[in-house]
């Protein structure tokens, strides 16, 4: 229950920050263009707080923190006095209207850049892209445990999360990946990971596991959490014991233990379970029992081992971080557009479209991992908001920009009827997209 409320809280914080910047972009440029702003609202519904400025703008915080809006003086929406007509949005030139509408997404793009600059200055703690175990395609490529991936297809890699993202993108593009690695003794080498051999279709969320890369920080001996009464483990194994090996095979994860117990059961002989209990190392001979479901069991429940300390963090000076933030914003934009293209063309599953439930969970998880991770999450979300708002769908900023582009081409605005039809189409498209996102959230 604690995680549920924490997720809601961090989602509200995230949306509030991003929406405030987005709407301020519209507001600031509108004021510079001489448009009267009637209301600047963060959130919808009943106002929880409001204040009117000397310029006549009402600033509002709404009860439903899932968006916001800037309401401008417009003759198409209400009667406007003769004295104020020059301040109406619809009276401004096409280029001024384009600037006002584009300012929202641009503000989110600038926020993304600013957040990345802060991130490069303070640093983001992470785990290096060090391989803990190499199997399948990774082993065939000549990758070994202890190898640290430093670049993929010429793009520098400093963490496992960057490596995972690049490998996933290459796999979805059905392309092989060239990995530069540094071995445990400093030896450098290059390996081609034949991602084109991955059986189609595959789960894009688990590409590294599918190619046989298990990151070192994830491989920790499991800890016994509970003993089932009446099981063969009762009296032999105790809560808090750490499983080190089964029949001489090192146990580096809960998944390892499960697979090793199944093998013992299939082989039909007792196995030696090596455990650490405090400072003592013990070897126990146990035979798993088969459950009614056909699964071999010892009768224990485990927790993952202790998470190791972060081993990767890069910091830069205030000035040195500026070009890095600009470059990273460009790379993230290209990556995001690439993913959207893959979803549209069918190279990637539509399951990658996330809704508010997933966003809330990710917001909470990133906040738990530290300030740097939360800032990185905000930068990604801000960039996504900028890109999505530029989609040429009526209702979104991109739809309005499409209307103004048509107006420039034909020399006059679209008819009210045509724009109304576009709004209905936009509503339908947006509702479908949101429905898919919610569906993916519920399935996830």
From Swiss-Prot:
Top EC class for this record: hydrolase
Protein name: Putative zinc metalloprotease XF_1047
Keyword Cell inner membrane: yes
Membrane topology of the entry: Multi-pass membrane protein
Residues in PDZ domain copies: 192-276
One matching Pfam family: Peptidase_M50
Cofactors required: Zn(2+)
Transmembrane segments: 98-120, 371-393, 418-440
Family note: Belongs to the peptidase M50B family.
